[in-house]
């Protein structure tokens, strides 16, 4: 055995402790839709990077187009742009049994696609019993029937695909389960699948004046209770339109009251680089405005981007 002097040993220990004391820069992944007309995976990936994005929505591709799936995965990996999510926006609780079966099959296929392309998740809402608006309110959306049916749907989707990489996630909605972190925890425990994960959409969960005004506390509560399961997040903002009843309206990040300082700090603390994805804006200019605002808040907090 080689001799190690006391001085060398002490130097190593000091160096190790010093290394522990160094704080790694906080970084998050950030993205949004792009408006490129190209269908080429390489060009699409580079356009995300040109816009300063390190995360993307999955480009259009069919589950049976294996060549394009591989091309997308490889092109985006080369640019260090992760595919944050595959949207699976269908009503899993449609009152029409035929539509419900078709929607379940569609969402199952979207999870399979997410797994094949290397996306972080496939995401949907739990659905609604509303017969007219697929995501609309209904008195039974907080019922035991709704909860049990959602658990069954999530299990069916995950068990059919058996994903190796992607997760299946349900978004919060203000008028359906889960509408907050506690209902989300109940859902996680009931589904009882490792492939079931959390998709944070802060604005979707703000369904009262109290949550609107105390949204920083709501954000921190969501991450404190759900952080270990978070795989992706949505970015937008809310303003209160003054009427004779409560009316919140989605706006460009920075124009509303969402506490992005709290949001970005909680994201940066996660053990994984869960992407933050802007959505629901109308034009490239609005997305650019929202991105500038989010980056300015991050810069003030010392948070960087991949």
Provide a role label for each language-model segment.
Residues 13, 19-22, 78, 97-198:
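Active-site acidic/histidine proton-transfer and metal-coordination neighborhood
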Residues 20-39, 47:
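C-terminal segment of N-terminal export signals and the immediately downstream linker at the start
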Residues 23-25, 43-50, 65-85, 111-118, ...:
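Acidic (Asp/Glu)-rich catalytic clusters
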Residues 34-42, 58-69, 91-95, 130-132, ...:
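Acidic-and-aromatic substrate-binding clefts and catalytic sites of carbohydrate-active enzymes
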Residues 48, 56, 76, 103, ...:
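Conserved, mostly hydrophobic/aromatic
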């Amino acid at each position: 055995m080689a001799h190690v002097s006391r001085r060398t040993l002490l130097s190593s220990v000091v160096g190790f402790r010093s290394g522990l004391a160094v704080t790694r820069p906080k970084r998050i992944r950030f993205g949004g839709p792009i408006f490129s007309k190209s269908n080429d995976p390489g060009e699409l990936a580079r356009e995300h990077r040109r816009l300063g994005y390190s995360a993307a929505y999955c480009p259009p591709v069919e589950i049976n187009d294996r060549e394009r799936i591989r091309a997308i995965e490889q092109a985006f990996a080369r640019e260090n742009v992760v595919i944050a999510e595959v949207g699976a926006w269908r009503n899993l609780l449609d009152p029409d049994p035929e539509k419900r079966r078709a929607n379940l099959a569609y969402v199952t296929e979207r999870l399979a696609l997410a797994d094949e392309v290397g996306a972080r998740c496939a995401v949907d809402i739990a659905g609604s019993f509303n017969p007219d608006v697929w995501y609309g309110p209904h008195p039974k959306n907080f019922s035991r029937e709704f909860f049990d049916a959602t658990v069954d749907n999530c299990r069916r989707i995950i068990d059919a695909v058996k994903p190796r990489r992607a997760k299946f996630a349900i978004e919060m909605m203000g008028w359906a389960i889960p509408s907050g972190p506690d209902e989300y925890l109940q859902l996680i425990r009931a589904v009882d699948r490792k492939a079931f994960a959390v998709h944070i959409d802060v604005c979707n969960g703000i369904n009262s004046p109290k949550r609107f005004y105390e949204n920083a506390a709501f954000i921190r509560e969501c991450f404190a209770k759900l952080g270990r399961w978070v795989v992706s997040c949505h970015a937008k903002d809310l303003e209160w339109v003054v009427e004779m009843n409560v009316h919140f309206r989605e706006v460009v990040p920075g124009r509303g009251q969402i506490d992005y300082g709290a949001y970005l700090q909680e994201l940066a603390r996660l053990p994984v680089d869960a992407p933050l994805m802007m959505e629901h804006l109308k034009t490239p200019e609005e997305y650019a405005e929202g991105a500038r605002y989010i980056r300015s808040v991050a810069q003030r907090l010392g948070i960087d981007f991949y």
